[in-house]
């Protein structure tokens, strides 16, 4: 069997017909808050409302459904940080197939539980590897040994075509309301979504600019297409945006992206966290980190999108509630609202009250106070966390901290120290 490497609009049209009674046609919603904030017309494609709460069902079902009966009977495997696994599990249950699903050990518990829920007895889960790429290597080895069929999360023509049905759906919905779009913002992990969407848009709405969005700590497509002009493997990636933390993109997705994606945006993980909280509080949308990437990119593109009509694909909503504390912490650090210092603190009654009176501003709060080391001397080493009401107050706060302890250490500027102590 010849392995195909080119995706056509015909592939996407055929995938659309296969998926018509399988996936949900998710809403294309006008967003008043973002439209007012950026002085443009912002529409959100709500794939967080899909049956498995992400777009990944489209590609997984399409890729599995084209297998022969003989191939289906041998069973399927996949490697996934969560959402593709849920799509494969849902499909395995629907088609009554055996599936072995490999997931990194860092996968949020919520996503693991959802895979079990969707796949039930049809699915076996193997947790292995710290990153997707390590997990992928183990899955491929297992697939070969057991002569099963690997369902690639992004580097497969049928997976990409399935994701591309999103673009067809967007254009169909827009046509009903006589709309056209100037920009589409979509997240990039391995590149399956951006490849499918860009393929269809460039054929049917060539004036629309396609903007790929990656987390700063895992910008493998940008590094490959723009910087290196060939596929690179990132040595280290930040795994926080787990749905888009891929060290190496696919060769098929790379070839499509370099020809059809107009620009790339890298978004700081802290900015993603701020977007997650903003979407929840302002729009009542529960987005996972990768699902919030497209909206996060608008801040960097605010001049270009003014008075334009744009679509942000909210690619997933599988967020683990147990991560919210970390999300809030990362957001506060990014917004420069929370600050940590190591101080030599007087070990005598009333010292903390003096610190509050002399160092803290009237609207500042102490969020952490912990002795690293108590001694018999006059001072002890303390970690102190301070949350500001306004980030503009930081300079004055640092000045007052220096007066209190000229030898203080500002932890925010040292990522390694922060990870060790906070």
Curated annotation (Swiss-Prot):
Its EC number is 4.3.1.19. One of its GO terms (molecular function) is pyridoxal phosphate binding. PROSITE patterns: ACT_LIKE, DEHYDRATASE_SER_THR. The keyword Amino-acid biosynthesis applies. It catalyses: L-threonine = 2-oxobutanoate + NH4(+). Residues 339-413 form the ACT-like domain. One of its GO terms (biological process) is threonine catabolic process. Its cofactor is pyridoxal 5'-phosphate. Keywords: Amino-acid biosynthesis, Branched-chain amino acid biosynthesis, Isoleucine biosynthesis, Lyase, Pyridoxal phosphate. The modification N6-(pyridoxal phosphate)lysine is found at residue 56. It is an enzyme of class 4 (lyase). SUPFAM superfamilies: ACT-like, Tryptophan synthase beta subunit-like PLP-dependent enzymes. The keyword Protein biosynthesis does not apply. Pyridoxal 5'-phosphate binds at residues 83, 189-193, 315. Pathway: Amino-acid biosynthesis; L-isoleucine biosynthesis; 2-oxobutanoate from L-threonine: step 1/1. Catalyzes the anaerobic formation of alpha-ketobutyrate and ammonia from threonine in a two-step reaction. The first step involved a dehydration of threonine and a production of enamine intermediates (aminocrotonate), which tautomerizes to its imine form (iminobutyrate). Both intermediates are unstable and short-lived. The second step is the nonenzymatic hydrolysis of the enamine/imine intermediates to form 2-ketobutyrate and free ammonia. In the low water environment of the cell, the second step is accelerated by RidA. NCBIfam families: PRK08639.1 (NF006390), THD1 (TIGR02079). Homotetramer. Belongs to the serine/threonine dehydratase family. This is L-threonine dehydratase biosynthetic IlvA. The lineage of its organism: Bacteria, Bacillati, Bacillota, Bacilli, Bacillales.
């Amino acid at each position: 069997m010849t392995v195909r490497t080119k995706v056509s609009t015909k592939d996407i049209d055929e995938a659309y017909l296969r998926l018509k009674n399988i996936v949900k046609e998710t809403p294309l919603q006008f967003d008043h808050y973002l439209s007012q904030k950026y002085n443009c017309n912002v529409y959100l494609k709500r794939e967080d409302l899909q049956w498995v709460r992400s777009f990944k069902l489209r590609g997984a079902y399409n890729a599995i459904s084209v297998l022969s009966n003989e191939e289906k009977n041998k069973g399927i495997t996949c490697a996934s940080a969560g959402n593709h696994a849920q799509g494969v599990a849902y499909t395995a249950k629907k088609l009554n197939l055996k599936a072995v699903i490999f997931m990194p050990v860092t996968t949020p518990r919520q996503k693991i539980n959802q895979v079990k829920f969707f796949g039930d007895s049809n699915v076996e889960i193997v947790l292995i590897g710290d990153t997707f790429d390590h997990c992928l290597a183990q899955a491929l080895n297992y697939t070969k040994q057991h002569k099963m069929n690997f369902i690639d999360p992004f580097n497969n023509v049928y997976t990409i075509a399935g994701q591309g049905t999103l673009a067809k759906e967007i254009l169909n919905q827009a046509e009903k309301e006589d709309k056209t779009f100037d920009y589409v913002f979509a997240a990039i992990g391995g590149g399956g979504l951006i490849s499918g969407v860009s393929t269809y848009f460039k054929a049917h709405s060539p004036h629309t600019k396609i903007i790929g969005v990656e987390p700063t700590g895992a910008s493998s497509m940008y590094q490959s297409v723009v910087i290196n002009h060939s596929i690179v493997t990132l040595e280290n990636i930040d795994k926080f945006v787990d749905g888009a933390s891929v060290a190496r993109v696919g060769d098929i997705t790379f070839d499509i992206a370099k020809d059809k994606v107009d620009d790339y945006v890298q978004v700081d993980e802290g900015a993603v966290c701020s977007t997650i909280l903003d979407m929840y509080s302002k729009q009542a949308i529960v987005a996972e980190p990768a699902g919030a990437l497209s909206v996060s990119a608008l801040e960097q593109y605010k001049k270009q999108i003014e008075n334009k009509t744009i679509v942000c694909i909210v690619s997933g909503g599988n967020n683990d509630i147990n991560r919210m504390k970390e999300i809030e912490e990362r957001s506060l650090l990014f917004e420069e609202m929370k600050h940590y210092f190591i101080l030599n603190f007087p070990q005598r009654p009333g010292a903390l009250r003096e610190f509050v009176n002399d160092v803290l501003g009237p609207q500042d709060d102490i969020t952490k106070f912990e002795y690293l080391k108590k001694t018999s001397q006059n001072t002890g080493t303390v970690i102190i966390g301070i949350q500001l009401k306004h980030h503009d107050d930081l300079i004055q706060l640092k000045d007052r901290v220096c007066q209190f302890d000229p030898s203080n250490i500002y932890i925010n500027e040292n990522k390694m120290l922060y990870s060790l102590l906070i």
